[in-house]
Amino acid sequence: MDLLAASVESTLKNLQDKRNFLSEQREHYIDIRSRLVRFINDNDDGEEEGEGQGMVFGDIIISTSKIYLSLGYEYYVEKTKEEAITFVDDKLKLMEDAIEQFNLKIEEAKKTLDNLNHMEDGNGIEEDEANNDEDFLPSMEIREELDDEGNVISSSVTPTTKQPSQSNSKKEQTPAVGPKEKGLAKEKKSKSFEENLKGKLLKRNDEVKKKVQPSKVDTENVYTFADLVQQMDQQDELEDGYIETDEINYDYDAFENSNFKVNDNYEEDDEDEDEEEYLNHSIIPGFEAQSSFLQQIQRLRAQKQSQDHEREEGDVNKSLKPILKKSSFAENSDKKQKKKQVGFASSLEIHEVENLKEENKRQMQSFAVPMYETQESTGIANKMTSDEFDGDLFAKMLGVQEADEVHEKYKEELINQERLEGEASRSNRRTRVSRFRKDRASKKENTLSTFKQETTRSVENEVVEKEPVVGDIIEKEPVVGDVIEKEPVVGDVIEKEPAVTDIVEREPAVNDIVERKPVVGDIIEKEPTINDIVEKEPEINSKSEFETPFKKKKLKSLQKPRSSKSMKKKFDPKILENISDDDYDDDDDGNKKLLSNKSKNNTDEQDKFPSKIQEVSRSMAKTGATVGSEPVRITNVDYHALGGNLDDMVKAYSLGLYDDDLEEDPGTIVEKLEDFKEYNKQVELLRDEIRDFQLENKPVTMEEEENDGNVMNDIIEHEFPESYTNDEDEVALHPGRLQEEVAIEYRRLKEATASKWQSSSPAAHTEGELEPIDKFGNPVKTSRFRSQRLHMDSKP
């Protein structure tokens, strides 16, 4: 208490010294302000002498003509008179506020010191405490005798010190308390409201002291728990002797068949706890009332003991086996001499307890969870917490394979057996051919057969009449293939003779020439021309483009082939008429597909064609033909000339000059809505082939390149104003440019200082320590833009 009072006194002294210093400084600045006011008046009057050489007042220097304010470290700045007066006024205001705060602190320190002094002088209060102790429950010694089962046999309550009777204590206290109360009443009238508050605070402190006071029980004669245990062990050794653990045998059957009622013991424990509560915090005042209350408790205990005794006698009448087996007197004497030992039974019964671990986990949740989640989790948990033996899990732990799995020893045999069976099934299985391919093959055979029949008939008739002609034509068989290709040659000659030079290749043309009887008849009738053909063979072989077989033909768009000189030949105009009519008829019949596929079977067909047809075709290819006196040219295509004229290119494309690089069968061409029916039928037939093609040729996806770089903005060029045209002025020092640079620099510094202030402010650290969460316990995320905006709004 003395140390606390001394610290309060030192604090009070420091506060008073600071207040006195501030009051002195306040008077000093008031004097400075008055001098500044007079200094202004003197200047207004025009007096330049002033106050001599000038004066120094700490932070302010007043000279004859100027006023200076201190910046610290002996640096001064010139100020005007008005600025100096405002500076002094601010200083005076701050000093007055500080003096008020010190006055409040000094008053509080004085009150605290008065309270401490009043507590030291509280002798009368201690006497009141001694008198008030009698109102509380006196300390007493309670002794109870217990039987073997823990029941109370007898109890006694004795006070530690003799308590005077309540009547005598009241008589002794009344004369002493009377004058004190009168004196206190007079003092209360003279005390102020604050002193009354001090008295209330003292009463509260007194109550705390009364509760904390130590008990008056004699601790030397009180038994501790260790003493009680030691005493009980000694008593057991005297009664039973020292028993070894090997000699102890428990009769578990008797223990299971016995009926123990534990509820009574729990009730007694509860009653004992209630009694202890009553003893510690008694509601009944006075010693006599307390003693009568304890007597009633003893009476109730005696009644309860008698009831328990009667109940035990009724239970003893029943035939129950004792827990410990009875032994003879000799065995008891031997056991007393031996040491105590503890043994274990040979067989035990194990009772399984339900595992509630998963259920407890589900119940321990710190946050509210939606109902649908709990239902799902409980359903799964109930399945997992079943007590049934999981044989599959046990088998997996042992490494046992499932019934469907095959052992590694027999896997190779099974794989070989499956491979042999697959090969056998493939050999026995018929090769599947789509109906679409069958139809195509059948159409080819039919067209070839009809074509052969017609050609053989026409040729046989002519061969019988003109045998010598056949002998001259047999020599050049390969030319037939080239003659077969040139359908458009003769077809276009009928329409316009000059156009024949631009057209070379069209496969179906010569097939029609071979089929027509009049054509062969006309060629065979003119023996001199055929002889001319035979004589001019070397010249044609060297220059004609028809000498190459069909498979070696290379005609590409916009590529000029080798040119050949035109051959003159007398030619009958009836041939052109027959060829032109038949050409258009064949296009209507739809034999284009067959004629386009002739390139594959060309070698086979040449062997089967009659020799007369081959000779006639060779003669037409090697020699020129004449219509009257005018020669018919063999057509040559000038691809470079076609490239310059779009109309000619379109016409050549429609005639099929560019079809040499196309596939044999383009497939179904969809030109109308009705064509989709045929297309869908073919899709159904070729479903397996389409699937295989899609698996073999997977589409290649092109990955888009991602470019995270900055996107270039448009560059805006500003024209220089007229003021920049002056060479003497620098562009960087122009007022507009300077203002722009100042604004940019100010913006940058403002952002830097704001970020630095946010990082260094303690509020930012405290906000970072707390993480907001929702009702389910998930963290709530806020954007940085939103948090910065809220933070800037919250700033003053």
Curated annotation (Swiss-Prot):
One of its GO terms (molecular function) is unfolded protein binding. Its main location: cytoplasm. Pfam families: DUF3835 (PF12927), Prefoldin (PF02996). GO terms for biological process: 5S class rRNA transcription by RNA polymerase III; formation of translation preinitiation complex; positive regulation of transcription elongation by RNA polymerase I; protein folding; RNA polymerase I assembly; RNA polymerase II core complex assembly; RNA polymerase III assembly; rRNA processing. The keyword Phosphoprotein applies. Residues 81-121 form a coiled coil. GO terms for cellular component: cytoplasm; prefoldin complex. Residues 152-168 have a biased composition (Polar residues). Residues 579-589 have a biased composition (Acidic residues). The modification Phosphoserine is found at S580. Keywords: Coiled coil, Cytoplasm, Phosphoprotein. Residues 152-197, 300-344, 421-458, 535-624, 752-796 are annotated as: Disordered. SUPFAM superfamilies: Prefoldin (SSF46579). Residues 427-441, 551-568 have a biased composition (Basic residues). It is found in: Cytoplasm. Residues 169-197, 306-318, 535-550, 601-610 have a biased composition (Basic and acidic residues). The keyword Phosphoprotein applies. Present with 1300 molecules/cell in log phase SD medium. Belongs to the prefoldin subunit alpha family. Involved in gene expression controlled by TOR kinase and nutrient signaling. May also be involved in positioning the proximal bud pole signal. This is Bud site selection protein 27. It comes from Saccharomyces cerevisiae (strain ATCC 204508 / S288c). The lineage of its organism: Eukaryota, Fungi, Dikarya, Ascomycota, Saccharomycotina.
